[in-house]
Amino acid sequence: MKALFAAITMAHALLQTQASLQNPNLLPTPPMGFNNWARFMCDLNETLFVETADAMAANGLLAAGYNWLNLDDCWMTHQRAPNNSLMWNTTKFPRGLPWLGSYVKAKGFRFGIYEDAGNLTCGGYPGSLGHEELDARTFADWGVEYLKLDGCNVFPEGGRTSEQQYEHLYGLWHRILSGMPHPLVFSESAPAYFANEKNLSDWYTVMDWVPRYGELARHSTDILVYAGEGSAWDSIMVNYRYNTLVARYQRPGYYNDPDFLIPDHPGLTMDEKKSHFGLWASFAAPLIISAYIPGLSEEDIGYLTNRDLIAVDQDPLAQQATLASRDDEVDVLTRSLADGSRLVSVLNRGNSSVQRVIPLQWLGLNPGQRYQARNLWDGTEKRIRKDLTVTVRSHATEIYKFTGSNGRVDAVSTGIVFNTASGNCLTGDAAGVGFAPCTGGEKQIWQVRGSELRPLSLLGECLTADGTRLSLRPCAGDEAQMWSYHISGNLKSGHEGGCLTEGHGVASCGWELNSQVFGLPSGVRVSGY
């Protein structure tokens, strides 16, 4: 019944609205800019935004592409006006938000704002529930072009489940914004309210519909705020991990948002700051800085304006880097770029320097060819033929762009196939096929050619559905060796339509079950869009 209801709801939504993915020109590349929340929280005002705009225009951030200035929570009064419209806090914004919008636009920025889908914002200010059309018109009248819609204080109504209530409200906002003469960029925070459950079915379900309604979605926990307790690096790694689980959703017009860049957080080393930026760029994620911009160091401005990495982030393919391999300390991520080159990012999660020798085949490249590898941090280049040898400091990320003799490479989608709930890797060798903790190595790295999955440990053999069992057999092109990857994260067999299932081989496909949702390498065709 759940699956039937969702199918009907999805079909109705597609008939009633124009999906954001069908209008990628609204936001053809991920947004870059500034938001006050992680650095200042509710301590925002006109002076902060004027000083931020002035500093970004002077220090090169605006010229580098950081052109959004977005207010977060607490900008409004605690009560609506007699006509039910929202009002800005005149103590914080004495000249008003229309004036502020005009000021930042005159400098070359665009203007964004925050609201909440519930009856109150997270900070206790008026939410938009019941006032959606009025608030949308108000924002447009003020010159707002971007709406971040949070999801605090959303309660089920009309017999809906919590997930259905969120879809109802965010779908309503999408219809309103899409019907405006100049639609606003729509940032959805709905998935974050389902991310920390042991049963991820509702989170997966919300992630299924947010690309239809908005241009980006905050999919998980908030990044650690400046005044917060705990490890800023650990917070970055939590959001990094969540982002690796949802690569299948991203494409031009919709972007997974792992939250703000925090370059002036006192708990981060320079390597950690650069990793944060470099990984987000590798993901083609939004690059929204939350920091005291006038106080950023020259070194911070230097890496934040790295032209090569910004070009990666803004690449028109918008392909998200995915895991080529993973072991106890090191993640290797790859993606293809629009110019035909291959991006390789190597993250050291461990607490000491490591060296890795990474075979080109792990990266989806041909070990018989020569490549030029450009280090995107310092611009140095080296020739690579058989493997990439790299030394990576603790919590650092090395990033390379591989090109062939004609500037392009013929990459094959290659990487781990992992269960996004357990984190375990599909593992195949002469001993059989199953799931195990990810430890790196050829038996956990798969080539995806068309509909076939082949482990690098046995490239002549294909993942095969033997009834409910999995095996490796010589590739013969029959239905039992054909697999299709779906937006739900299901990997479906061409033989009787069962789904890959951790712990059960192949089983009947359920509704967004933890055991049946998988991450695959970038470049694999995703059905269901």
Swiss-Prot record:
Its EC number is 3.2.1.22. Its main location: secreted. Residues 408-528 form the Ricin B-type lectin domain. Coiled coil: none annotated. Keywords: Disulfide bond, Glycoprotein, Glycosidase, Hydrolase, Lectin, Secreted, Signal. It catalyses: Hydrolysis of terminal, non-reducing alpha-D-galactose residues in alpha-D-galactosides, including galactose oligosaccharides, galactomannans and galactolipids. This is Probable alpha-galactosidase A. It comes from Aspergillus terreus (strain NIH 2624 / FGSC A1156).
